[in-house]
C-alpha cells in the first residue's frame, strides 16, 4: 500500500475584529440555524461595532436566507472596510458549504488574483487548500508564491502536482468533483467538509474525500455504490484510474 497523506482545508484563526462573529457562526451553524439567526441579529445591533464586522454579519445572515445577491453587496462592503479580506473570503466559503452552494465556492476561488505576498498566511493557505479539493490546481499555482513555508503547504503542493500529472483537463476535474457534491446535496446528505488523500510516492494517485455526518457503515457503502453508478451514468469520460471519489464518515477525521 502506498504511503498517503490528506489535505483538508484548515480554517484560519479569526482576526480580533471578527472573532465574536466567527464564534457565533461556528458555535451555532451545525446545531440551530434559528439560534444562529437570533445571535446574528443581536450582534448586528451592537453599538461600537466596526463597519466591516457589521457588514460581514449581515452578509452571513443573508447567505443563510439564500439571498445571495444581497449578501454579495455586504461582502464587498465588509472587504472594503477591513484589512482582512482573505479571512472574509474564508468565512464566505464556510457559509457556502452550509448552504451547499458548491459552485459558488468554485467561482469565488476563481476570482483570486495571482499573489506574491500576503499579510494573511493562514487564510491564504485555507483558500489554496480549498482550491485543490475543488479540483482547481491552477488556482493553487496563482497563490503558491505567497504561501508561507510549512510542512502543511509542502503537502498542498504535492497534492496539487498529483492532480496536474494525471494530465486530466482541469474543467473535467472541477466538473466531476462539483457534480458529486451537488448530487449528495440533492440526496439530502449534508456535507460537513472534504479533503484530498494523495500518494506520497506515486504522483498519479489521489482520492477526493467527502465527509458526511453518517455513522452507519452499511449506509455509507450504499451511498458510495449509488455515487459510482451516478458518475458512470452521467459522465461519458471517466476520471483517470488513479483519481477516485469516496464518501466517508466525519467520525474518521483525526481531531488530535
Question: Where are the language model's segments positioned?
Answer:
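Helical anchoring/docking segments at protein termini
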Residues: 162-256
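Alpha-helical protein-protein interaction scaffolds
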Residues: 14-152
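Alpha-helix boundary/N-cap detector
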Residues: 16, 24-31, 35, 154, ...
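N-terminal presequence-like segments and adjacent domain-start helices
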Residues: 142-143, 150-173
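Charge-rich, low-complexity amphipathic helices
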Residues: 1, 43, 93, 100-101, ...
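Catalytic core of pol beta-like nucleotidyltransferases
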Residues: 1-11, 20-24, 239-256
Amino acid at each position: 500500500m502506498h504511503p498517503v497523506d490528506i489535505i483538508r482545508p484548515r480554517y484560519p484563526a479569526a482576526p480580533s475584529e471578527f472573532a465574536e462573529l466567527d464564534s457565533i457562526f461556528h458555535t451555532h451553524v451545525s446545531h440551530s440555524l434559528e439560534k444562529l439567526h437570533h445571535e446574528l441579529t443581536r450582534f448586528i445591533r451592537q453599538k461600537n461595532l466596526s463597519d466591516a464586522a457589521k457588514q460581514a454579519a449581515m452578509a452571513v445572515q443573508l447567505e443563510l436566507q439564500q439571498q445571495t445577491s444581497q449578501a454579495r453587496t455586504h461582502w464587498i462592503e465588509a472587504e472594503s472596510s477591513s484589512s482582512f479580506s482573505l479571512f472574509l473570503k474564508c468565512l464566505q466559503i464556510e457559509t457556502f458549504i452550509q448552504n451547499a452552494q458548491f459552485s459558488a465556492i468554485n467561482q469565488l476561488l476563481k476570482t483570486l488574483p495571482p499573489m506574491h505576498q500576503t499579510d494573511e498566511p493562514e487564510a491564504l493557505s485555507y483558500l489554496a487548500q480549498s482550491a485543490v479539493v475543488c479540483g482547481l490546481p491552477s488556482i493553487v499555482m496563482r497563490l503558491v508564491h505567497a504561501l508561507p513555508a510549512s510542512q502543511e503547504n509542502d503537502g498542498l503542493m504535492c497534492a496539487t502536482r498529483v492532480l496536474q500529472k494525471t494530465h486530466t483537463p482541469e474543467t473535467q476535474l472541477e466538473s466531476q468533483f462539483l457534480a458529486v457534491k451537488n448530487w449528495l446535496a440533492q440526496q439530502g446528505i449534508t456535507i460537513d467538509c472534504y479533503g484530498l488523500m494523495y500518494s506520497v510516492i506515486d504522483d498519479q494517485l489521489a482520492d477526493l474525500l467527502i465527509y458526511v455526518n453518517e455513522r452507519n457503515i452499511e449506509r455509507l457503502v450504499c451511498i458510495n455504490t449509488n455515487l459510482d453508478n451516478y458518475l458512470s451514468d452521467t459522465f461519458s469520460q471517466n476520471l483517470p484510474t488513479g483519481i477516485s471519489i469516496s464518501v466517508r464518515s466525519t467520525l474518521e477525521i483525526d481531531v488530535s
